[in-house]
Amino acid sequence: MNLNFNIKKDFKNIEVFPTAGALGAQIENVNLSDNLPDNIIEEIYDALLTYQVIFFRNQKFEPRTQKAFAERIGKPIVYPFVKSLDEFPEITPILKKETDINNFGGIWHSDTTYQEEPPMGTMLYGIEIPHYGGDTEWSNQYLAYESLSEGMKKFLNTLEAVNISGKARVAKTRSDIMKHASVGLKGDELRAVHPVVRTHPETKRKSLYVNEAHTTNFVGMTEEESQPILEFLFNIKLNQNSLVDLDGSQDQLQYGIIDAQCTILLMIITAKEG
């Protein structure tokens, strides 16, 4: 089996360092709040397509400059469940208080697959990060698909899956943050159907497009019938070298860009010291 793991690619205008064998890269000596020339933006985007998750250290953004940068990469949208900044509805603060016990995003997921047109990516800006914990993992869903047998690939390519916003486990991860910043939506209001295997519109590579947080069943099958196959697909990330981990405690002011079309992620729940 020939899996396409992370390889070093040369860039002319930016310094890119792969961070793991499966996906992820660190980009150095770029200030994202500057009015960067088009050739730099193009290479940043190329790095995103190549490595699926890219990180930038020591970034300082105001909401205005963060939105301006995001608009050069894609089209920012509004997250439907949590209150955003008043003047910048595309930016959603993710705040965890000392008394909160649930991690927002603390289940393997791809963002908002319950929407008819989910976003192509997500941008995360770590402003105040704990010295202990705060880690995030990503899984390369290209590799998840490529690890399958030809028979399983052929079968999955015929399927579509239902995705909803209100599965019990993901609703629980929102519970603390929605106490403080809910916009009033009920968890089961949003639903969409997507192919189980999607082809990336730019790289043309195939990847799995199901996730534990939102996918409930295959179209034409009950949840009970779908569950064994879905559980197998959900667990592929644990059975192969498809992961990268970001130790959030190492850097404040860290910026990440994720290609949501071919990755899933998990905000790790860390036990308290002592």
Positions of PLM-derived features:
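Non-heme Fe(II) oxygenase catalytic core, chiefly the N-lobe of the double-stranded beta-helix
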Residues: N2-Q252, I258-G274
